[in-house]
């Protein structure tokens, strides 16, 4: 515990100019860790101590599951990318809830990303998500409905508005009923057609969601089966962000993920309308203190542009 506190003091963002407020939650810095690393909510404090402004745990399913057979994770070093077909391997919502109830030794904003249990048929998906939400929404700083992983059969079908509306409506009822109303976001794929991106944005506004995370991994590649993350995703992720900003303005919190490697990427996403930015593959290649380094550089960028806060830069080029 003491070591975590020392690390947090040394590397976590502390400058007021980096603070961000989104959907009623206060973040010490805009750059967080995307879901996929801390699948069981086991080490969020340690991750935050390395310089992240928030940690999104999961993806967590209602029932524990082993995920797909190994090998299921592949580095593409030359492309600064990763292909994964993990398949939501996790111990389940009950195990995650036990960990999330424990007191934290350092302050950390924890988002909880939930997905569909693999063996649950599509017709029962809503009930499956609701089961996770009931356990985890009261323990989360924000909740994310993941309908965009390519590694659970049929999951991406749930991005169709006709299926997504009842799913999000049901989960939102659970999130809204928590003592402090847990903010709810949806995470979408980069492979959606532009008109489908627009449709999800309109649905999010209609239902009163708090935000959209864009984007998950892509299946548009020629390598191993699975979702591709990292540098090759950069261009499309930025396109989707700009489209969402044009569609929603500042009515939704936009969280940009996909191809984020350095401070220039983070700054570009903020200028394009992202209030928060997430990375994972960039951290793999950038080393343990990747987020701390970017936050330091981002602070210098804010000062160089004569801004009092990073929030003043959100959407400046949108």
Stretches with model-predicted labels:
Residues 117-130, 157, 163, 186-205:
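Active-site glycine- and acidic-residue-rich loops that bind
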Residues 3-16, 150-163, 197-250:
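Glycine/Thr-rich beta-alpha phosphate-binding loop at enzyme active sites
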Residues 51-65, 147-149, 211-221, 266-293:
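Glycine-rich phosphate-binding active-site loops on the catalytic face of alpha/beta enzymes
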Residues 24-32, 106-112, 176-192, 244-256:
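Short beta-strand/loop segments at the ligand-binding rim of alpha/beta enzyme cores
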Residues 64-80, 221-230, 284-308:
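C-terminal helical cap(s) of enzyme catalytic domains, especially alpha/beta-barrels
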């Amino acid at each position: 515990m003491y070591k975590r506190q020392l690390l947090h003091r040394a590397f976590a963002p502390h400058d007021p100019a980096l603070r961000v407020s989104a959907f009623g939650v206060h973040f010490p810095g805009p750059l967080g860790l995307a879901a996929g690393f801390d699948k069981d909510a086991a080490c969020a404090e340690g991750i935050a101590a390395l310089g992240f402004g928030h940690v999104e745990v999961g993806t967590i399913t209602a029932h524990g599951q082993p995920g797909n057979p190994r090998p299921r994770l592949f580095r593409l070093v030359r492309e600064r990318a990763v292909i994964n077909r993990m398949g939501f391997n996790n111990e389940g919502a009950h195990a995650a809830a036990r960990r999330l109830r424990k007191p934290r030794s350092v302050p950390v904003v924890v988002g909880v990303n939930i997905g569909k249990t693999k063996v649950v048929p599509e017709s029962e998906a809503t009930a499956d998500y609701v089961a996770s939400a009931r356990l985890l929404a009261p323990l989360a700083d924000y909740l994310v409905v993941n309908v965009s992983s390519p590694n659970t059969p049929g999951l991406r079908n749930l991005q169709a508005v006709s299926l997504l509306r009842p799913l999000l409506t049901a989960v939102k009822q659970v999130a809204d009923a928590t003592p402090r109303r847990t903010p709810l976001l949806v995470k979408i794929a980069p492979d959606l057609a532009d008109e489908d991106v627009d449709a999800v944005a309109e649905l999010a506004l209609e239902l009163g969601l708090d935000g959209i995370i864009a984007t998950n991994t892509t299946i548009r590649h020629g390598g191993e089966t699975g979702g591709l993350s990292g540098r090759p995703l950069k261009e499309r992720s930025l396109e989707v962000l700009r489209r969402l900003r044009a569609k929603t303005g500042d009515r939704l919190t936009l969280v940009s993920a996909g191809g984020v490697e350095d401070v220039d990427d983070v700054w570009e996403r903020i200028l394009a309308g992202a209030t928060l930015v997430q990375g994972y593959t960039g951290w793999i290649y950038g080393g343990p203190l990747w987020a701390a380094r970017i936050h330091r550089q981002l602070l210098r960028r804010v000062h160089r542009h004569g801004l009092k806060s990073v929030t003043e830069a959100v959407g400046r080029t949108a």
